[in-house]
C-alpha cells in the first residue's frame, strides 16, 4: 500500500490529524454526526468519532480506487480465483444469494440451495424423534460461527432441541457436556472440512462410543466419503461443504446445521437473507457510500497511519457475547499475513490484534487501560436499539453506557489531579442493530466479512488461506509418540525438557 501513488498524500493527512482532538474535528465539521452516519437495512453505523476528516477520507478512497477495490469485489462475487495460493474461489456469498450473472457463482448458489433442502429434511426427521439434545463437534470455523449464531438467536424458552458445542481437544470439555445428557435422547453432528482435524476426530470418537454407535450421528464435510467411513455414518446423514468456502466463512453452508437445529430452519434462512441484503450493498454501492468499505478503510487508517496495534470489540447485548471470539478468527486468520499475493514481503503492517468482550462487564476489567493507558485502542461498540426482554430499565442503562463510554473515550476530561485526568482521543465506531433478529445478525456478520476483504485488498494479501496454522499442528502430531512414552527424535532442547516433565 505504501507504494501507491496516493500514499504520500494520505501520510501527510495522518501527520496532520494524529494529534487532533476529536471534539475539534466535530467542531470543524458541524454536520459530522450525521454525515458520518449510515443506515443499511437493519444496521446503523456512526463513524463520527474516528480520527479522520473529509480530506483524509478522500485520500483513502483514492488509494482504494488505485487498488481497484470495486473490481476486487466483482472478482470475489463472480467466483474468480481470489484465493490465489490455493487456486480457489471464495464463494461464501453464493451460499446466501445470486447477485451476478457469473455461471460459476450461479451454479454454486443452486448447489448450496439443494444441500439446504436436504438439511431441512434432516431437521424435520430429527424433530420427529425423541431426541432432545444435539452435540455439535467441530473447531475453528466449524464451531465459532455456529456457536455465535446459535447462542445469539436461540429462544429463551420452548426450544424443541438444545444444541451443545464441543471444540477443544481437552477431554474436560466433552466430559462436562456429556455429563448433563442422556445418550438415548442425544444426537451428534461432526463438522470438519477435511475430516482430518485431530480435535474433531478425537472428540468424535468419544461421542460415537458414548452414543453406542453411529445411528444418531450426522456429519458435515468437504470429504463426505471420509466422514462416512471414519464413523460408519450413513451417507444420507452426511452433508457436503466445498473447497470454495473457507472454514471461517462457512456458517452459511451445511456447517450451519446446528444453527438451524437451535433456532429453527426458517430463521436460519432469514439469517442468510440478511447477509445477502448486505452483500448487495457491498457489491453495488459506490465506494464513498459503502459501509463495508468505510469500515475496512477505517481499520487500515488506524493500523497503518495512526499506528494502533490492537482493536477492541464491545458488544452491548449479552446475546452477542461470543462475537469478539468469532471476529478474532475471521479477522486475524484472514489478515495475519506477512507476504503479498505474489509472495513478496508486505510493505506495511497488516492485521491488528482483535479482542474484546461484553458490556458492561468489560467496563470493570480492561476499560481502565482504554481510558488512561498509554496505548490508543480503536474500538467498535455494538448494541441494539430495541430489545425484546421484559427488563426495559436494564436496556436503557445498557445503552446509556454505550453513549457515555464512547463520549468519554473520545473527549476525555482534564483535571488538576493527573491521576484523574482522561486524555481522550480514543476513536470508536458505534454499530446499532434495530433489533437482534436473524436478518440483522446476518447483515452484521456479512459486513465484517467484507470489511476484512477490503483490508486484504488494500494490503495486497490473501484473506482466504491460513498456512500459519499448519506448523504447530504438524509438530504436535510428531510429538504424540514421545508423549505416549515411545522413542522419538526430539531435536529442540526446551521441548525435550518439557517432555521429561510431562512424562514424569
UniProtKB/Swiss-Prot annotation:
Q: Does the keyword Isomerase apply?
A: yes
Q: Which family does it belong to?
A: Belongs to the GPI family.
BP GO terms, sorted: gluconeogenesis; glucose 6-phosphate metabolic process; glycolytic process
Q: Does the keyword Isomerase apply?
A: yes
* Gene Ontology cellular component annotations, sorted alphabetically: cytosol
What is the superkingdom listed in this entry's lineage? Bacteria
Write out the pathway annotation from the protein's UniProt entry. Answer: Carbohydrate biosynthesis; gluconeogenesis; Carbohydrate degradation; glycolysis; D-glyceraldehyde 3-phosphate and glycerone phosphate from D-glucose: step 2/4
Q: Name one Pfam family in it.
A: PGI
Its Enzyme Commission number(s) read 5.3.1.9
GO MF annotation: an example: carbohydrate derivative binding
What positions constitute the catalytic site?
A: 333, 364, 473
Which InterPro entries does UniProt cross-reference here? G6P_Isomerase, G6P_Isomerase_C, Phosphoglucose_isomerase_CS, SIS_dom_sf, SIS_PGI_1, SIS_PGI_2
Under Gene3D superfamilies, the record lists: 1.10.1390.10, Glucose-6-phosphate isomerase like protein, domain 1
**Can you name the source organism?**
Xanthomonas oryzae pv. oryzae (strain KACC10331 / KXO85)
> Which HAMAP family does the record associate with it?
G6P_isomerase
Q: What function does this protein fulfil?
A: Catalyzes the reversible isomerization of glucose-6-phosphate to fructose-6-phosphate.
UniProt-recorded name of the protein: Glucose-6-phosphate isomerase
Task: Quote the subcellular location field of this record.
Answer: Cytoplasm
Q: Which UniProt keywords apply?
A: Cytoplasm, Gluconeogenesis, Glycolysis, Isomerase
Reactions the enzyme catalyzes = alpha-D-glucose 6-phosphate = beta-D-fructose 6-phosphate
Amino acid at each position: 500500500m505504501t507504494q501507491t501513488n496516493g500514499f504520500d498524500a494520505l501520510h501527510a493527512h495522518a501527520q496532520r490529524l494524529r494529534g487532533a482532538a476529536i471534539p475539534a474535528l466535530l467542531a470543524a465539521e458541524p454536520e459530522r454526526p450525521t454525515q458520518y452516519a449510515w443506515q443499511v437495512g437493519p444496521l446503523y453505523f456512526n463513524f463520527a468519532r474516528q480520527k479522520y476528516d473529509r480530506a483524509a477520507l478522500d485520500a483513502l478512497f483514492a488509494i482504494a480506487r488505485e487498488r481497484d477495490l470495486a473490481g476486487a469485489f466483482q472478482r470475489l462475487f463472480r467466483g474468480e480465483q481470489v484465493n490465489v495460493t490455493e487456486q480457489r474461489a471464495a464463494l461464501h456469498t453464493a451460499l446466501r444469494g445470486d447477485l451476478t450473472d457469473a455461471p460459476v457463482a450461479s451454479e454454486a448458489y443452486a448447489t448450496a440451495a439443494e444441500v439446504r433442502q436436504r438439511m431441512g429434511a434432516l431437521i424435520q426427521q430429527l424433530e420427529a424423534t425423541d431426541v432432545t439434545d444435539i452435540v455439535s463437534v467441530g473447531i475453528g470455523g466449524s464451531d465459532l460461527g455456529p456457536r455465535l449464531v446459535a447462542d445469539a438467536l436461540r429462544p429463551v424458552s420452548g426450544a424443541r432441541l438444545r444444541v451443545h458445542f464441543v471444540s477443544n481437544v481437552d477431554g474436560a470439555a466433552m466430559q462436562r457436556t456429556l455429563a448433563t445428557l442422556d445418550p438415548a435422547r442425544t444426537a451428534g453432528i461432526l463438522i470438519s472440512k477435511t475430516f482430518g482435524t485431530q480435535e474433531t476426530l478425537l472428540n468424535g470418537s468419544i461421542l460415537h462410543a458414548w452414543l453406542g454407535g453411529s445411528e444418531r450421528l450426522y456429519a458435515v464435510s468437504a470429504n463426505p466419503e471420509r466422514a462416512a467411513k471414519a464413523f460408519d455414518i450413513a451417507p444420507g446423514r452426511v452433508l457436503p461443504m466445498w473447497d470454495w468456502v473457507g472454514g471461517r466463512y462457512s456458517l452459511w453452508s451445511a456447517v450451519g446445521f446446528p444453527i438451524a437445529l437451535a433456532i429453527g430452519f426458517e430463521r436460519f434462512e432469514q439469517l442468510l437473507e440478511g447477509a445477502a441484503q448486505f452483500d448487495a450493498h457491498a457489491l453495488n454501492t459506490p465506494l464513498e457510500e459503502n459501509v463495508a468499505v468505510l469500515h475496512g478503510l477505517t481499520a487500515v487508517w488506524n493500523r497503518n497511519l495512526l499506528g494502533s496495534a490492537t482493536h477492541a470489540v464491545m458488544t452491548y447485548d449479552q446475546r452477542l457475547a461470543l462475537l469478539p471470539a468469532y471476529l478474532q478468527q475471521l479477522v486475524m486468520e484472514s489478515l495475519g499475513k506477512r507476504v503479498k499475493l505474489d509472495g513478496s514481503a508486505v510493505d506495511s503492517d497488516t492485521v491488528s490484534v482483535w479482542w474484546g468482550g461484553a458490556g458492561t462487564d468489560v467496563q470493570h476489567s480492561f476499560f481502565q487501560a482504554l481510558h488512561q493507558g498509554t496505548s490508543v485502542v480503536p474500538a467498535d461498540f455494538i448494541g441494539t436499539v430495541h430489545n425484546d426482554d421484559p427488563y426495559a430499565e436494564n436496556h436503557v442503562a445498557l445503552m446509556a453506557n454505550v453513549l457515555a463510554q464512547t463520549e468519554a473515550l473520545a473527549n476525555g476530561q482534564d483535571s488538576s489531579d493527573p491521576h484523574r485526568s482522561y486524555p481522550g482521543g480514543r476513536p470508536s465506531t458505534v454499530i446499532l442493530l434495530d433489533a437482534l433478529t436473524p436478518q440483522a445478525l446476518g447483515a452484521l456478520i456479512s459486513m465484517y466479512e467484507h470489511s476484512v476483504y477490503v483490508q486484504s485488498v488494500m494490503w495486497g494479501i490473501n484473506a482466504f488461506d491460513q498456512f500459519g496454522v499448519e506448523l504447530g499442528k504438524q509438530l504436535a502430531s510428531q510429538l504424540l509418540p514421545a508423549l505416549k512414552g515411545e522413542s522419538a527424535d526430539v531435536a529442540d532442547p526446551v521441548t525435550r525438557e518439557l517432555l521429561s516433565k510431562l512424562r514424569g
